[in-house]
Each structure stands twice: as structure tokens, then as C-alpha cells.
């Protein structure tokens, strides 16, 4: 099943196997050609960063063959946010508090803008020696910061890695529920902020929407915002339902404006991944 029908050799000494593997790895690093031998190094744990709500947003999955490189675009969580904190973790759990912090750095100097507008590209690069380099770049200004994480400082032992993998399997259902709750909360909050900006920003609908419709949206948004602040323990289903209730009020008003000359583009619903995860 695991060796394409071939019978594995059970007669080799374990110590010899380690020695053979080390010799092969040395040859690969030195660029020597090895006939009929393929030895692949992989990432022992998933690598990612923390996003809003303490979510572990994965960039490089566990067992990815190295060297490897992966980029993903993120944005800001607050209006006029001047900086983002990049916290790098390894682990398999849904929340970063249950994973292992490898390092962190701050990218500052982000020009004032509404939340979700700045584009921050985060790139993870793992070289053939397992050294991780993380860089964050503000695509608007070109400013960037980074960090290099080596294998000899602050990394987990083999036993700790195995424990993290076992814990991820043990708490898989609990982690799934936690992730769904945080994502549902973020979706509702994003929609609330999007609707507020839409009816108050002159570049969007402020000059096109009727006063009564604007007040209807703002009233529904305030009710949802108050509910969210007073129900921090709400589960994902309650959060999703609250989002649907808010959309039921806002979307017909927005849709009504489509047919007007110079009307707006369609507004996304709260459960769509409009831009990117927020930092």
C-alpha cells in the first residue's frame, strides 16, 4: 500500500539507515548526482501568521517539500491604521495561542486609508536548509520589513512537534468550531463597517442615497453593532443569522440604487471573501 507493491527491506540496522540518510542529504546539498535516490526535506509543521481574532492563517502547510515560497495579500483592520504587526507561528491548531511563536516584526509607515484598502503582501520563503525568511511589503509605498528564522534558535524538538500534531488531531472538532465562530464574527463586523462606510463616504453612496434609506441602514447597523458587543459568546450560527438579518435590511436599498444613473457597483455580502484577511 505504501511502497507501490514492493516489499520493504527489514534487515537494515536503524543506525545504518540514519547514516545512509545523512550521507545522501550531504550529497544533495553539495550538488552531487545520486542515481535512483530521491530524498525530500519537508516542513515539519504548518507555518503561518496571526490575523484578526487570533486566527492562524496558514501560508505553508505541514509536509510541504522544501525549498518553497508562498505569498498572500492581507490588509488593515482599522481605519487609518499606520502599522501592522506580523507574528509568525508554526503549528496545526486553529488559533495562534495554541501554536508556537517563531518571531514577530512590525511594518510601519502605512499611509492613512480606510480599513481593507491597504494591500500588505506577506511572503514566506523556506530554503533547502530549512531556514525561514518572512517579508511583509506595503504594495502602495513599496516599504518592506522582514525576519529570518533559523533552525538553531527557538524551534521545537521532535517530541514537541509530535505533541502538536497529536493535539491538532485530538482537538480537531473544537478547533473547527472556534475557527468558524471567529470567521463568522469577522464577516459580520466587516459587513457592519462596510455598510457604514458605504452610506457615509461621498465617493460611494452618501450623495446618492435618500435620507430615509440612509437612516434605515445606519439604524440596522447600530443594532447589529450593539448586539455584537453584547454577545461576545454567541456561536457561529447566531452570528451568521445576525449577518443575514442585517443583509435583509441593507441589500434591497443598495440594489434599488443600481438602476440609477451613476449608481454604485454591487456591494458584497458579508460572507464573501472580498479583499483579504486583516492584520
From Swiss-Prot:
Positions of short motif Prevents secretion from ER: 276-279
Transmembrane intervals: none
EC numbers on record: 3.6.4.10
Documented activity regulation: The chaperone activity is regulated by ATP-induced allosteric coupling of the nucleotide-binding (NBD) and substrate-binding (SBD) domains. In the ADP-bound and nucleotide-free (apo) states, the two domains have little interaction. In contrast, in the ATP-bound state the two domains are tightly coupled, which results in drastically accelerated kinetics in both binding and release of polypeptide substrates. J domain-containing co-chaperones stimulate the ATPase activity and are required for efficient substrate recognition.
Enzyme class: hydrolase
Signal peptide: none
UniProt name for this protein: Endoplasmic reticulum chaperone BIP
Higher taxonomy: Eukaryota, Sar, Alveolata, Apicomplexa, Aconoidasida
Gene (name only): BIP
Amino acid at each position: 500500500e505504501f511502497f507501490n507493491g514492493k516489499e520493504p527491506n527489514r534487515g537494515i540496522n536503524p543506525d545504518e539507515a540514519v547514516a545512509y540518510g545523512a550521507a545522501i542529504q550531504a550529497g544533495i546539498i553539495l550538488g552531487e548526482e545520486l542515481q535512483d535516490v530521491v530524498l525530500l526535506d519537508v516542513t515539519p509543521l504548518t507555518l503561518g501568521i496571526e490575523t484578526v481574532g487570533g486566527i492562524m492563517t496558514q501560508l505553508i502547510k505541514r509536509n510541504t517539500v522544501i525549498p518553497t515560497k508562498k505569498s498572500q495579500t492581507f490588509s488593515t483592520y482599522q481605519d487609518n491604521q499606520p502599522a501592522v504587526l506580523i507574528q509568525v507561528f508554526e503549528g496545526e491548531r486553529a488559533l495562534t495561542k495554541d501554536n508556537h511563536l517563531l518571531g514577530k516584526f512590525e511594518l510601519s509607515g502605512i499611509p492613512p486609508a480606510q480599513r481593507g484598502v491597504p494591500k500588505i503582501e506577506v511572503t514566506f520563503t523556506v530554503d533547502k536548509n530549512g531556514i525561514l525568511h518572512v517579508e511583509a511589503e506595503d504594495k502602495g509605498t513599496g516599504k518592506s520589513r522582514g525576519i529570518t528564522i533559523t533552525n538553531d534558535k527557538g524551534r521545537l524538538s521532535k517530541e514537541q512537534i509530535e505533541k502538536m500534531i497529536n493535539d491538532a488531531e485530538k482537538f480537531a472538532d473544537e478547533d473547527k468550531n472556534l475557527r468558524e465562530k471567529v470567521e463568522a464574527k469577522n464577516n459580520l463586523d466587516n459587513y457592519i463597517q462596510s455598510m457604514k462606510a458605504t452610506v457615509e463616504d461621498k465617493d460611494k453612496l452618501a450623495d446618492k442615497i435618500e435620507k430615509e434609506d440612509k437612516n434605515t441602514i445606519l439604524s440596522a447597523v447600530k443594532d447589529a453593532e450593539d448586539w455584537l458587543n453584547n454577545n461576545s459568546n454567541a456561536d457561529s450560527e447566531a452570528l451568521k443569522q445576525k449577518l443575514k438579518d442585517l443583509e435583509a435590511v441593507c441589500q434591497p436599498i443598495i440594489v434599488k440604487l443600481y438602476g440609477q444613473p451613476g449608481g454604485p457597483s454591487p456591494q458584497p455580502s458579508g460572507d464573501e471573501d472580498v479583499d483579504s484577511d486583516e492584520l
